[in-house]
Amino acid sequence: MLVNRWLFSTNHKDIGTLYLLFGAWAGMVGTALSILIRAELGQPGALLGDDQIYNVIVTAHAFVMIFFMVMPMMIGGFGNWLVPLMIGAPDMAFPRMNNMSFWLLPPSFLLLLASSMVEAGAGTGWTVYPPLAGNLAHAGASVDLTIFSLHLAGVSSILGAINFITTIINMKPPAMTQYQTPLFVWSVLITAVLLLLSLPVLAAGITMLLTDRNLNTTFFDPAGGGDPILYQHLFWFFGHPEVYILILPGFGIISHVVTYYSGKKEPFGYMGMVWAMMSIGFLGFIVWAHHMFTVGLDVDTRAYFTSATMIIAIPTGVKVFSWLATLHGGNIKWSPAMLWALGFIFLFTVGGLTGIVLSNSSLDIVLHDTYYVVAHFHYVLSMGAVFAIMAGFVHWFPLFSGYTLNDTWAKAHFAIMFVGVNMTFFPQHFLGLAGMPRRYSDYPDAYTTWNTVSSMGSFISLTAVLVMIFMIWEAFASKREVLSISYSSTNLEWLHGCPPPYHTFEEPSYVKVK
């Protein structure tokens, strides 16, 4: 029965499918919001109205894309579908908790949408800094609803993290050590640890903000001995690990895709890849104040956060060059998934380079809160995380659905998206260097040219989304079933065919370790 199968599911494949569908839908909402932003900025002058409504849209765009698109698709979708298959487990460790993790997300999304429907909306930016987020500048229920939304999404992620950690550590076959699990499994494990350690700090920060707003506490109010900078420290102690949470599963996906389409049986430097991810995860927790170079930190504090941030480039470089080494000498198949993966490697590296620029505290004084920062993080998210999701999606679509995508449409989709995102975000580096600030709905007309180019690019990206929807419809309409799969010991998830049966590995799997 439909209700029993889809509402009360305890099956990792069905829950993974729910996550993917929810993430895709949220992604379209987030895309619509981004199109509104770029429409407003396409030329000087007002389109939507004042800066409050503009900032409500910007804030909602960020929250929707981060908490309801990237995280549900990468961790909930790919994680649920693939982790049990890759380690030979019958399901997740806590199947009912898995269902609850998913069903906390729609109510959370509803609360976020409600926050923009009441009063003037939450126009705080995704950082929700007080005093702007306090009850003077944002009277009414909007910010409170946003905080409750974040609480639900956070609980969902924490439960999911506990589930993945338990599954990966406890549900491997006895003969399989942790260092024999695929890189995607490692990436999800490390991501889960980051979630478990960082989200409670966010919960504390936004709960203190909630009591400041409603119960007359003064955690972030100097009038009562509080300090708004405390909120920034709490938020960014979560916020920086969060950006690694968004990209780490992508690293895992790219490792699998690059290995598969290079005709290699294993990625180059497996151990180096694992340690690099662990290093990135650890370092992600000790660099948070690089988001705060303009708030008046001591010079020695700034020196530390600058150098610590630059250190992250080393394990990241290990990963990039290992992917290139995996490609080297391989029998490369130019499939759509491989194109997404190669696009990821190139554009993620560009985003990483601008990150190195921003890690310099002296330069960041000039670039902070300009479009240079926007360009930087959209290169690593809109062309890192999203390209990784697309690579994983077109690679594993036959596994999830049993049908194959049309190769030509998939390549066309990649080409349109590649042009669109680059045309959107590359000019923003110029705007930032010229001093255009973020989070404003209008600008001096000296900035018109590049904003117009950027907005045109965003409509090309929108076209790519429409092509993708058609491409998926075409696959299900044509029903081209998978005939054969090139299966090897390093891509265990394909073992049961496409799609795999509802229950896999019902008996403990026998793994012979070479």
From Swiss-Prot:
GO biological process: aerobic respiration; cerebellum development; oxidative phosphorylation; positive regulation of vasoconstriction; respiratory electron transport chain; response to copper ion; response to electrical stimulus; response to hypoxia
Acyltransferase is among the record's keywords: no
Mitochondrial intermembrane-side segments: 41-50, 118-140, 213-227, 287-298, 358-370, 434-446
Lipid bilayer topology: Multi-pass membrane protein
Keywords from the named record: Calcium, Copper, Electron transport, Heme, Iron, Magnesium, Membrane, Metal-binding, Mitochondrion, Mitochondrion inner membrane, Respiratory chain, Sodium, Translocase, Transmembrane, Transmembrane helix, Transport
Cofactor note: Binds 2 heme A groups non-covalently per subunit. Binds a copper B center.
Binding locations of heme a3: 376
E.C. code: 7.1.1.9
Pathway given in the UniProt record: Energy metabolism; oxidative phosphorylation
Intracellular or extracellular location(s): Mitochondrion inner membrane
GO CC, one annotated term: mitochondrial inner membrane
Binding residues for Na(+): 40, 45, 441
Pfam families: COX1
Reactions catalysed, as given in the entry: 4 Fe(II)-[cytochrome c] + O2 + 8 H(+)(in) = 4 Fe(III)-[cytochrome c] + 2 H2O + 4 H(+)(out)
Binding site for Cu cation: 240, 290-291
Residue ranges of the TM segments: 12-40, 51-86, 95-117, 141-170, 183-212, 228-261, 270-286, 299-327, 336-357, 371-400, 407-433, 447-478
Catalytic class of the enzyme: translocase
Known partners and oligomeric status: Component of the cytochrome c oxidase (complex IV, CIV), a multisubunit enzyme composed of 14 subunits. The complex is composed of a catalytic core of 3 subunits MT-CO1, MT-CO2 and MT-CO3, encoded in the mitochondrial DNA, and 11 supernumerary subunits COX4I, COX5A, COX5B, COX6A, COX6B, COX6C, COX7A, COX7B, COX7C, COX8 and NDUFA4, which are encoded in the nuclear genome.
PANTHER family listed in its UniProt record: CYTOCHROME C OXIDASE SUBUNIT 1 (PTHR10422:SF18)
Family named by the database record: Belongs to the heme-copper respiratory oxidase family.
Function per UniProt: Component of the cytochrome c oxidase, the last enzyme in the mitochondrial electron transport chain which drives oxidative phosphorylation. The respiratory chain contains 3 multisubunit complexes succinate dehydrogenase (complex II, CII), ubiquinol-cytochrome c oxidoreductase (cytochrome b-c1 complex, complex III, CIII) and cytochrome c oxidase (complex IV, CIV), that cooperate to transfer electrons derived from NADH and succinate to molecular oxygen, creating an electrochemical gradient over the inner membrane that drives transmembrane transport and the ATP synthase.
Name of protein: Cytochrome c oxidase subunit 1
Gene from which the chain derives: Mt-co1
